[in-house]
């Protein structure tokens, strides 16, 4: 299935009109994608049947968050789930560039309790060891992984992408 990254209601409508079945809904794509507005989510649900995976990210500039930023993201997650997002894309890292298991687990519990899907986003591309990271994500129970193979674009990370797909593709 093709998933298109969208930064607005209009982007999602255009994707839907082109036959896309799933979008990752963001705001501020120029900042790498931040949490979208509830209004965008509500309107997309109202005007299309496209599957929506909503980004949960409080700010640009890395994937280690203060306690207040994390709390804000958790509140946004609960609202997005309550308003019908089909899935959620998020990622938390520790200062040493490993997966923050505790924060990911709390988010996953909220997502899974609502019967939705969880994607670990491109925070993966900032991890220190992609093999350790993907095994952690599988153990935690993520459904999908969004990565460019730890490079700026997927073409440059194709060798890592191919290896991860070969070794772990049936697990995440």
Range-by-range predicted roles:
Residues 18, 47, 83, 139-140, ...:
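Structural motif
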Residues 21-34, 79, 83-95, 140-155:
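Glycine-rich phosphate-binding active-site loops on the catalytic face of alpha/beta enzymes
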Residues 73-83, 103-115, 138, 142-143:
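Short, electropositive alpha-helical surface patch
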């Amino acid at each position: 299935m093709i998933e298109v990254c969208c930064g607005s209601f209009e982007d999602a409508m255009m994707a839907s009109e082109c036959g896309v079945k799933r979008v990752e809904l963001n705001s501020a794509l120029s900042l790498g994608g931040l949490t979208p507005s509830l209004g965008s989510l509500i309107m997309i649900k109202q005007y299309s049947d496209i599957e929506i995976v909503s980004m949960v990210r409080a700010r640009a500039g890395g994937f280690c968050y203060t306690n207040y930023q994390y709390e804000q993201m958790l509140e946004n997650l609960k609202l997005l789930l309550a308003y019908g997002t089909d899935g959620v894309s998020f990622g938390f890292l520790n200062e040493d560039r490993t997966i923050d298991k505790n924060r990911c687990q709390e988010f996953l519990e909220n997502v899974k309790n609502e019967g939705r899907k969880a994607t670990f986003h491109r925070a993966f591309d900032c991890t220190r060891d992609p093999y350790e990271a993907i095994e952690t994500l599988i153990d935690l129970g993520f459904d999908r992984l969004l990565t460019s193979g730890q490079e700026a674009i997927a073409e440059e990370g194709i060798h890592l992408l191919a290896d991860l797909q070969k070794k772990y593709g049936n697990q995440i």
